[in-house]
Amino acid sequence: MSDTTLEKIIVLDYGSQYNQLIARRIREIGVFSELMSHKVTAKEIREINPIGIILSGGPNSVYDEGSFDIDPEIFELGLPVLGICYGMQLLSYKLGGMVEAAGEREYGVAPLQLTGKSALFAGTPEVQDVLMSHGDRVTAIPEGFHVVGTSPNSPFAAVENTERNLYGIQFHPEVRHSVHGTEMLRNFALNICGAKGNWSMENFIDMQIKNIREKVGDKKVLLGLSGGVDSSVVGVLLQRAIGDQLTSIFVDHGFLRKGEADQVMETLGGKFGLNIIKVDAQKRFMDKLVGLSDPETKRKIIGNEFVYVFDDEANKLEGVDFLAQGTLYTDVIESGTDTAQTIKSHHNVGGLPEDMQFQLIEPLNTLFKDEVRALGTQLGMPDEIVWRQPFPGPGLAIRVLGDLTEEKLETVRESDAILREEIAAAGLERDVWQYFTVNTDVKSVGVMGDQRTYDYTLAIRAITSIDGMTADFAQLPWDLLQKISKRIVNEVDHVNRIVYDITSKPPATVEWQ
């Protein structure tokens, strides 16, 4: 964020699978936090002006050649520093301590025994469960440090040098398995770093509106509106900031959920007054996809065609200088650090032609998904948009296995509407992370009205998750599943069988394609 007066704690990224959680937990306390590359220098940190620094965990060994390092001048800034797991080992190693391979690795929940008073552990019990996940351990601490906590396999599980405001813990306070981890992070942020804890979504809105107005001035902004949560929130935020200087292009490719296109136009165009150019490109997309079965081919064609349609419409407009996107903080982290690995491609408007000379505006690029929903609520947006299900860019087209036909597409659109209606009626729409139907491209024999049928089998996929990285299948009530199945078979043509996907992630992904 550009505002250097904002209280913030930065997290240096050393590759831990939990590093995003650290920033999230600090934000939940009411202090803004963001991840930064471990390559950041002390000089750059001075310019950022944080009130504290956290060193994340990571998979490396600090004593190996080429392991992720730190500018040693960072320890001389006079800022509170908290090292977590690898971060603790790095802090100890760089300041003269010793780190070696543990004789016995420590993975899972372990009891932490506090051995002395510490501001970091204020208000937490003397013995508490914490999550350990390390193959190395500190075997000698630097001069000026003393031990405040031990575990069965880590004699230096928590250490500190209060004179220099340096703290190290071998475990992960950011995960829920560390029962009092949030209290430790709160102690670090509020008591040790001296944060006021007053960062809120309301403050974020005021700051972003100010930033947008300063950046845009009297120029025009173009937004690719998908109807999803992210682009919708961007649209409403920009509308509040710059009003009629914003033009949104909404491409209806024909693979949206039932009633979605109309809802976007009525809510965002009507209630919130966005200037929306709706492009009906359903035939254009379908003509390109009819008969195709390979999911990657479908994705590429839809992505490319979207770019062409968007480009055609953008070229009709004059005097547009800025392009707005709904990029989230998770996208920035995945693409912007040297510790991240790409698992699958995104479907955002990221592949726009290079000759479209726009400056980017990404007002959500410091927010996580749950924070975007909170922002939408703060902006007065209705729940049906704010809590809309995550939806892939290619839409329902990748929820049809095998060759894509209008008939199969309609089975998914209608059955999905029934599923969403019944989940909402049961009051479970916020308990289930994501839910949808899939046309499996499998036909089976059935009997309906005393006649033999040979129709499609649809699958219901419903999952529970915290962050979407891992997921369990949702254990929906049997009577609810029975009701959904009965409605789909009776109300949706060409369907005679429903199955329920009971696979977790991993090994499966959320989507079938």
UniProtKB/Swiss-Prot annotation:
Cellular component terms (Gene Ontology): cytosol
Protein name: GMP synthase [glutamine-hydrolyzing]
GO molecular function: ATP binding; GMP synthase activity
Gene3D superfamilies the UniProt entry points to: 3.30.300.10, 3.40.50.880, HUPs
Catalytic activity line of the entry: XMP + L-glutamine + ATP + H2O = GMP + L-glutamate + AMP + diphosphate + 2 H(+)
Sequence positions that bind ATP: S226, G227, G228, V229, D230, S231, S232
Pathway recorded for this protein: Purine metabolism; GMP biosynthesis; GMP from XMP (L-Gln route): step 1/1
SUPFAM superfamilies: Adenine nucleotide alpha hydrolases-like, Class I glutamine amidotransferase-like, GMP synthetase C-terminal dimerisation domain
Residues in Glutamine amidotransferase type-1 domain copies: 8-198
Keywords: ATP-binding, Glutamine amidotransferase, GMP biosynthesis, Ligase, Nucleotide-binding, Purine biosynthesis
Originating organism: Lactococcus lactis subsp. lactis (strain IL1403) (Streptococcus lactis)
Broad enzyme group: ligase
Domain of life: Bacteria
Subunit structure, as described in the record: Homodimer.
GMPS ATP-PPase domain location: 199-388
EC numbers for this chain: 6.3.5.2
Pfam families for this protein: GATase (PF00117), GMP_synt_C (PF00958), NAD_synthase (PF02540)
Functional summary from the UniProt entry: Catalyzes the synthesis of GMP from XMP.
Catalytic residues in the record: C85, H172, E174
Entry keyword annotation includes ATP-binding: yes
